[in-house]
């Protein structure tokens, strides 16, 4: 009726569900996980972030390769033979598996380097900014560390790499780290690929949980972040709630927040 060329589902579909729906509607189908992965791919700026996103995309794609071949003509093979499409599909599976293995090896090397950096900072007081995507973590990092080079944008997933800057809080020196923002129903492939990055929060002496107080669903966002922190084993870390963007609230909103 709407003559749409693309249908997006706000949930993750299994390979068979995606395949069956595409056959039924005759349109390209994208689920929530694939859409978020595509957004991450657009935002990735460093080599580490690109590798992490590519790994998540490939692991998402692997069980769905057959569906991605449905637009090609298939030939039925005789006994003991395969059609050209099927042969190419098997080749693609091998290539994808090889690439996944290579990316995991490279990311392990990156993690070893990151561990060396952590060891060099073990005697410093470390705080990590965590929160729902676009809550304003990078803006707070820029303000507290007086670092104008910190990238700030009003959009989802503007930060994919942990970024650490020094901040002076009173007479104390703090290493403040910005982290990737969380979101409802974050694809499990992304959590796995970014685990080394996300686990920066486990090394923190204090978590600054940044909340966009102007968002009507901030309580749901807080619950999502708390859940992901628990999955990462960081739910026992000391947490300080930072309500951001309160200047956008009216008196009624401020009163509700105080309550």
PLM regions and their residue ranges:
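Conserved G1/Walker A P-loop phosphate-binding module
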Residues: 68-206
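Residues in soluble alpha-helical coiled-coils and helical-bundle/repeat scaffolds
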Residues: 63, 67, 101, 185-188, ...
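Short alpha-helical interface patches
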Residues: 32-39, 96, 188-194, 253-259
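Flexible, glycine-rich phosphate/dinucleotide-binding loops
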Residues: 38, 136, 248-249
């Amino acid at each position: 009726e709407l003559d749409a060329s693309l249908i997006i589902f706000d949930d993750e579909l299994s390979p068979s569900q995606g395949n069956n729906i595409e056959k039924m509607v005759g349109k390209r189908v994208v689920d929530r996980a694939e859409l978020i992965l595509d957004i991450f791919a657009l935002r990735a700026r460093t080599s580490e972030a690109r590798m992490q996103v590519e790994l998540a995309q490939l692991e998402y794609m692997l069980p769905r390769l057959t569906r991605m071949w449905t637009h090609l003509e298939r030939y039925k093979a005789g006994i003991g033979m395969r059609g050209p499409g099927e042969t190419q599909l098997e080749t693609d599976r091998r290539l994808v598996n090889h690439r996944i293995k290579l990316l995991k090896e490279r990311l392990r090397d990156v993690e070893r380097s990151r561990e060396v950096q952590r060891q060099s900072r073990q005697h410093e007081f470390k705080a990590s900014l965590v929160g729902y995507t676009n809550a304003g973590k990078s803006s707070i990092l820029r303000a507290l560390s007086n670092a104008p080079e910190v990238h700030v944008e009003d959009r989802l997933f503007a930060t994919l790499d942990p970024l650490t800057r020094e901040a002076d809080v009173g007479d104390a020196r703090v290493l403040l780290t910005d982290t990737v923002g969380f979101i409802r129903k974050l694809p499990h492939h992304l959590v796995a690929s970014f685990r080394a990055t996300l686990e920066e929060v486990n090394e923190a002496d204090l978590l600054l949980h940044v909340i966009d107080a102007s968002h009507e669903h901030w309580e749901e966002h807080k619950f999502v972040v708390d859940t992901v922190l628990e999955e990462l084993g960081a739910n026992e870390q000391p947490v300080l709630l930072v309500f951001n963007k309160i200047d956008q609230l009216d008196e009624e909103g401020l009163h509700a927040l105080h309550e």
